[in-house]
């Protein structure tokens, strides 16, 4: 199977399983960011592509637990690393590259320590997706459907934490440059929200 064929198969799988539907957009945006971040670097783009398209499968409704208490301790990364090999084999993805894909998925979160170039690129891209207008949109979209917060105040606290901690986690200089306008946009939004709502945000 050609490169284009297994990529299309992976995209189709995620398009079919993305629930809520708005979660689908994270994958193509994330991959586009990896291409910007990775420009001039030597890395396996197939590995990055497969990892960024599959990395959040475990947060989709239908893949994550329904019970709220179980969801609070749900390890979506462990779920994906278990499921991804069979999905990739079904898509005729090169089997020799699957371990590298799993390594990217295992270390894609801000608190993780990536050890490969592919993982570092993907992790930086995922951090950027949590900043700026997109980061705001994704955070607010979780209200009422995520166990981490249910009120606007809790969402505001999440945005404040993202602003404070995430930019410091970026490793690649291109990522840091791309973060500058995103940080400014998010900071402006947070300040406006605090000003407009005052003590009555709820």
Region spans (language model):
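Short glycine-enriched, charge-decorated loop/helix-capping segments at active-site entrances
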Residues: 65-71
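His-Asp-centered metal-binding catalytic motifs of divalent-metal-dependent phosphohydrolases/nucleases
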Residues: 45-65, 80, 102-110
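Divalent metal-dependent phosphate-bond-processing catalytic cores, especially two-metal-ion Mg2+/Mn2+ enzymes
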Residues: 5, 16-43, 54, 110-202
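Inter-helical turn/loop segments and adjacent helix faces that build the functional surface
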Residues: 91-95
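An active-site-proximal "capping" alpha-helix that borders the catalytic cofactor pocket
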Residues: 30, 74-89
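Short alpha-helical hairpin
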Residues: 1-12, 52-58
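Membrane-helix interface segments
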Residues: 44-45, 97
């Amino acid at each position: 199977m050609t490169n284009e064929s297994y990529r299309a198969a992976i995209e189709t799988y995620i398009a079919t399983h993305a629930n809520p539907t708005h979660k689908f957009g994270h994958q193509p945006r994330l991959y586009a960011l990896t291409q910007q971040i990775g420009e001039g670097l030597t890395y396996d783009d197939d590995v990055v592509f497969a990892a960024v398209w599959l990395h959040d499968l475990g947060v989709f409704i239908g893949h994550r637990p329904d019970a709220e208490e179980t969801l609070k301790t749900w390890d979506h990364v462990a779920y994906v690393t278990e499921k991804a090999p069979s999905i990739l084999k079904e898509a005729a993805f090169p089997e020799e590259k699957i371990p590298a894909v799993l390594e990217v998925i295992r270390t894609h979160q801000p608190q993780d320590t990536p050890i490969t170039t592919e993982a570092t690129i993907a992790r930086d891209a995922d951090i950027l997706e949590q900043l700026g207008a997109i980061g705001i949109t994704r955070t607010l979209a979780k209200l009422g459907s995520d166990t981490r917060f249910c009120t606007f105040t809790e969402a505001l606290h999440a945005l404040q934490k993202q602003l404070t901690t995430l930019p410091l986690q970026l490793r690649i200089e291109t990522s840091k440059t791309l973060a500058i306008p995103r940080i400014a946009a998010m900071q402006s939004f947070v300040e406006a929200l605090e000003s407009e709502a005052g003590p009555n945000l709820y």
